[in-house]
Regions:
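Conserved alpha/beta-domain cores
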Residues: 1-179
């Protein structure tokens, strides 16, 4: 994960490391995408990372998504980019013109409506109930949002917040998508 900082050089270091890892793993060039975690960074610093080539950002806290969204959207638009969930269904999706925006931290159900107009993907969803609520709200808004479920595959009690191992996870994922 690349973390935006005051120097675009840091992004160059992340890209170089990513390309080396792709080669080492025998992956196609460009098949690995970096997500810049923007926690504690202001809009100017995030835009410096975007100007340096970052094409996917993630915020850790829902309130930070809400606080930064308007400024980021305006600055991205000035540069010809769309950010997160575009208002216009016909918004450009040409590579390099759209910046996906992820919520990478925990989400409480009372904040779903506040982040849905902005983020493309919500990571670390730790209950099927929350996933279903996200799905219902997204459908009601006519948008699609990615959801990454946190599943406790090991069954260890050390991660009680995660969804217990599900033998029919793919069937459950299809169900959530239909609500």
């Amino acid at each position: 994960m690349c973390v935006p900082c005051r120097s675009p050089m840091a992004c160059t270091v992340c890209w170089t490391a990513s390309h080396r890892r792709e080669q080492h793993a025998g992956r196609d060039a460009g098949s690995v995408r970096l997500l810049a975690a923007t926690k504690t960074r202001d809009v100017g610093e995030i835009m410096a990372a975007i100007d340096a080539g970052v094409r996917m950002i993630g915020e850790n806290r829902p309130q930070e998504v809400m606080a930064k969204a308007e400024g980021l959207m305006a600055r991205c638009e000035e540069r010809g980019f769309t950010l997160g969930v575009a208002d216009d269904a016909g918004a450009s999706t040409i590579a390099g013109e759209h910046i996906p925006f992820h919520l990478i931290g925990q989400l409480q159900s009372n904040k779903i409506g506040k982040v849905l107009p902005v983020v493309n993907t919500i990571e670390s969803v730790d209950s099927l109930d929350l996933a279903e609520k996200i799905s219902r709200r997204a459908v009601a808004r006519g948008i699609t949002v990615g959801v990454l479920l946190e599943v406790n595959e090991s069954g260890e009690a050390s991660n009680p917040a995660a969804i217990p191992r599900m033998p029919s996870a793919s069937r459950k994922n299809r169900y959530i998508g239909r609500t």
